């Protein structure tokens, strides 16, 4: 039965033997385990198997039983995600088998939000087959197969919808199951689904060895790429990524905004990647006690408690807290209630960078203490050049992950990034010795054990001063006093300080993805006045991961996986709407739509 359901209609395993990556879209939420087992049993299997399973939130209520005799089912159960909407990427067999769960209120609507190139679809017919089949045609690769259970009155409408969308049906008219292959005789879509970057070799240059660059290097190396990682410092994680600790948590707000959905995706994916590093015996210096966020006002606390209930977030994701509850969690009196993230906390950014590079060391070459003054493309290869004009490294793919300098190297329209100075303060260990968990709100306070306590941070826009200022320390103390009013912090408890510079955009979203070809866009500006992101010309092989602001820990792993997926032509791990919100070309796109640039 399983053989006929998941393999024979799609000519598996023969078809995945002819490709490096095979993508199977499953709308029945039942194909993953049989496919994984068959892939494991096949010595001629593809390098990577992607299964994208689409379902409603209710599907997460029933994880595979840990009592199941199948070891694969038990492994899937251990990796089962939290019960929250959105996309969850689970990785098995050293990342060679990937399950992306796309969870929404309506499975068919969720399908339309994805961005991928599918080799096979497995689904049930619906009472709106035209919309469903248009989505299938939007994502179908050459020769993609469809197997649909379409019995009774659903059969003929489904067959007609498939045929009108460019599929050839091979099933007999009386069959309950429709089998079809994508073979359009006319153009059935505006944009082609994603293809791998046309690289002559699986080699990349990454500029910047902070959280962004180390994460990108690791995700590419994990796919078999050889990466040259360049940084101006002697060691990785020296700028903002060199802070003693950083806090990590998603945004939760009254509506499930783009920012809330993006930070949720980044937070959950980061937890998985960090756990994989810790399972490989890397110490990330991650705090175990969760993270407490203090509301700005009592009204905000009340509104957020209502939103948490309305979205039915599980308690392992976020919990509303009264002032009394929050004080108990923190171990000290807090000013107001708020919300608690049991899986949030603090972590060492430098330890994360070190672990990622160590885990992928065989495929990463470091070029430290090296300044990149310009980059160039000869139509095939990207090259990075030093201050004397010498070539540092070259490769078909380049990723700019060097914060403020990325926009300069790429020559992005309108200088879309700004620098924000942040000064943090390290206090004596006695200052916050009663604090049990990191607390954020107007500022942040992170217990560091014997290393003291970290508080901060100032937010000084366009301030280039690298010197530590007494006024900055006092501002940080004042911020913490507003959250933790019973603590009597004093300047004499200051042990040290540090200044780093955040890179931010005007919309406070990061820049993640392939960069636009701005010269071509300027030349074709009249034709692009009504463009969408997929309409824009792109720089072949050039990507960006920068402008992470204060959320580098949440953005970095998400950015790395999204960029690696774009380079490899794999399914994206977030909805296309969310990817558009962080697209580095979004400012150019707005300017084109508003007629602000032309062919002058």
Report each predicted region and the residues it spans.
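S-adenosyl-L-methionine
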Residues: 64-112
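C-terminal catalytic lobe of FAD-dependent flavoproteins
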Residues: 490-600
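Helical element adjacent to the flavin cofactor pocket in flavoenzyme catalytic cores
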Residues: 339-388, 392-397, 401, 406
